[in-house]
């Protein structure tokens, strides 16, 4: 679908991996907005009380989500099966790396929002920009900087410092972290259920 090997850090993939309409659906499903899956950049802290029928008492209520959407960059973890295309890309990356892969969906709604800053991750990351534009800075042997547009991807190896800055009002990207545990063989089932 996207790649056979990683010869460069940046490349072009197919567009429309994930849309804001699909994100809207996830944000309205409580299991995707619990405090273990939905992560907010910065020091945001919100408290809320669940309602009578909730089985997951730690789901963000809509009123709190609306507040943070206008202030922070956010991501939702455990989205490797958010749609068929994401599931397929996880499968392809698992074949390449021989390790489990997940998808974290990152989004923001204003330029230059509070983000995750310059940081490094313990896992290899393959990031696909779905909508909007972002500035990507990678500090490997030398600093690499690029403006990404929808369909562009960047591969960032583990322990390499990087920073993502939204430069359009709306930004949506999918980050595919590869398990950093050498003996991790806990792969998700990638068969797509059809009815």
How should these model regions be labeled?
Residues 1-35:
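An N-terminal JmjN-like helical accessory module and its immediate linker preceding a catalytic domain
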Residues 36, 41-152, 160-195:
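Active-site region of the double-stranded beta-helix
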Residues 155:
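Conserved beta-strand-loop-short alpha-helix elements that form
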């Amino acid at each position: 679908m996207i790649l056979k090997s990683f010869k460069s850090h940046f490349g072009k993939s197919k567009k429309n991996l994930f849309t804001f309409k699909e994100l809207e659906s996830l944000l309205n499903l409580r299991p995707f907005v619990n405090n273990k899956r939905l992560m907010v950049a910065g020091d945001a802290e919100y408290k809320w009380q669940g309602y009578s029928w909730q089985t997951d008492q730690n789901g963000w209520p809509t009123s709190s989500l609306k507040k943070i959407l206008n202030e922070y960059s956010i991501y939702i973890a455990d989205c490797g099966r958010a749609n068929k295309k994401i599931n397929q890309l996880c499968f392809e990356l698992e074949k390449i790396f021989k390790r489990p892969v997940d998808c974290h969906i990152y989004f923001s709604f204003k330029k230059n929002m509070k983000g995750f800053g310059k940081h490094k991750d313990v896992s290899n990351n393959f990031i696909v920009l779905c909508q909007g534009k972002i500035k990507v800075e990678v500090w490997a042997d030398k600093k690499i900087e690029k403006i990404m547009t929808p369909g562009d991807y960047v591969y960032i190896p583990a322990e390499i410092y990087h920073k993502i800055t939204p430069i359009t009002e709306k930004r949506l990207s999918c980050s595919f972290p590869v398990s950093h545990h050498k003996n991790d063989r806990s792969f998700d089932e990638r068969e797509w259920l059809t009815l």
